[in-house]
């Protein structure tokens, strides 16, 4: 089994030709082997292409989300996670780059931290956003120099190529697969561009990390990562990324245009408000678990009598669990089998778990 599954979501359109180019570059550059598998997940595309054959010819995994009517990064990530063979996941956007040297460091940290077994262990990666000039200038150098070139530009603040720095990439996290699935992955109510990664990251931090001190006014948004006060959710999000900085591990985000094709950018404000709503209720905000691929579509009825249960961890592997008290199917102290059968058909139940006391 591979140590790491890297999930790369993408969707093509004529307005964004660079996406196809970057998918091809990644499929050629990365090598799937016994330590790492690369999973390219295509969401909605409005442009025809032959990338499936190209990706598979380079010995990577290709998946297609046939249900998407509009492109969703979150849905692509969720599908990739369900199908991943490794117990550890990393999500990498098609615009982002990690060097092979840094992948080697990540693989070593995965083993040292035992992320495959420790569901609360994380690696949060910092990201350097590059300007338009960097897209062409970097290609004049051998890729083995890219890490040093970009980091030097960042550290001495030349900003020849660096647009800005974020201490945490909220979308590129190394996480235990079971934990990701039991937390429900990306909330698919976020439509189009923005904030599904913030929403997930907040739930991950709540579940996996205990902080001695939390920022004041968590709902405050500094709107950038250049803050000087421990205030707002960005200061909370930034805390874990510095560890990877000390190891010299960075993600580089290449510049791209942002056309609003297929209304992809249109819902950003709505997504922003949905994120704030969830953030204000962070202690209670919860999603149903996702399932591994072989359990997708399974619906399990958990019938109990005196005690309700929470089988989130089991749900990941057996299917979506619906909890019902057996008394709901009684009338005048008599079990009405027709009520139970109607419920099974209506909810399309495929399995039943019974409380031992029934």
What kind of region is each of these model predictions?
Residues 142-165:
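Short, flexible, basic/aromatic active-site loop/helix in glycosyltransferases
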Residues 96-109:
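Acidic donor-binding/catalytic loop of UDP-sugar-dependent glycosyltransferases
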Residues 23-66:
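Acidic donor-binding segment of Leloir-type glycosyltransferases
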Residues 1-25:
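N-proximal low-complexity "stem/linker" segments adjacent to membrane-targeting elements
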Residues 89:
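Short aromatic/hydrophobic "clamp" motif used to bind/position activated sugar donors
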């Amino acid at each position: 089994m591979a140590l790491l599954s890297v999930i790369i979501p993408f969707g093509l359109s004529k307005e964004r030709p660079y996406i196809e180019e970057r998918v091809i570059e990644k499929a050629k550059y990365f090598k799937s082997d016994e330590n790492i598998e690369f999973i390219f997940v295509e969401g909605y595309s409005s442009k025809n292409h032959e990338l499936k054959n190209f990706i598979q010819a380079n010995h990577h995994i290709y998946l297609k989300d046939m249900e998407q009517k509009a492109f969703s990064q979150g849905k692509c990530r969720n599908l990739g996670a369900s199908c991943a063979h490794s117990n550890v996941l990393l999500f990498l956007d098609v615009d982002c780059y990690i060097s092979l040297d840094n992948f080697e460091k990540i693989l070593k940290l995965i083993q040292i931290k035992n992320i495959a077994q420790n569901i609360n262990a994380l690696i949060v990666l910092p990201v350097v956003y590059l300007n338009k000039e960097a897209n062409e200038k970097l290609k004049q150098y051998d890729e083995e120099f890219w890490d040093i070139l970009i980091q030097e530009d960042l550290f001495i603040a030349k900003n020849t190529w660096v647009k800005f720095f974020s201490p945490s990439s909220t979308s590129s996290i190394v996480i235990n697969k079971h934990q990701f699935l039991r937390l429900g992955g990306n909330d698919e109510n976020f439509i189009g561009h923005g904030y599904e990664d913030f929403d997930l990251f907040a739930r991950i931090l709540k579940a996996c990390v205990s902080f001695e001190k939390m920022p004041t006014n968590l709902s405050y948004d500094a709107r950038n990562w250049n803050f000087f006060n421990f205030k707002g959710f960005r200061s909370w999000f930034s805390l874990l990324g510095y560890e990877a900085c000390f190891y010299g591990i960075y993600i580089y985000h290449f510049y791209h245009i942002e056309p609003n094709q297929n209304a992809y950018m249109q819902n950003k404000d709505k997504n922003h408000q949905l994120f704030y709503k969830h953030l204000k209720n962070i202690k209670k905000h919860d999603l149903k678990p996702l399932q591994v691929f072989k359990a997708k579509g399974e619906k399990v009825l958990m019938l109990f009598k005196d005690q309700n249960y929470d089988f989130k961890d089991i749900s990941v592997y057996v299917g979506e669990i619906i909890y019902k008290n057996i008394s709901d199917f009684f009338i005048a102290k008599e079990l009405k089998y027709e009520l139970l059968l109607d419920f099974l058909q209506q909810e399309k139940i495929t399995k039943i778990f019974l409380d031992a006391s029934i």
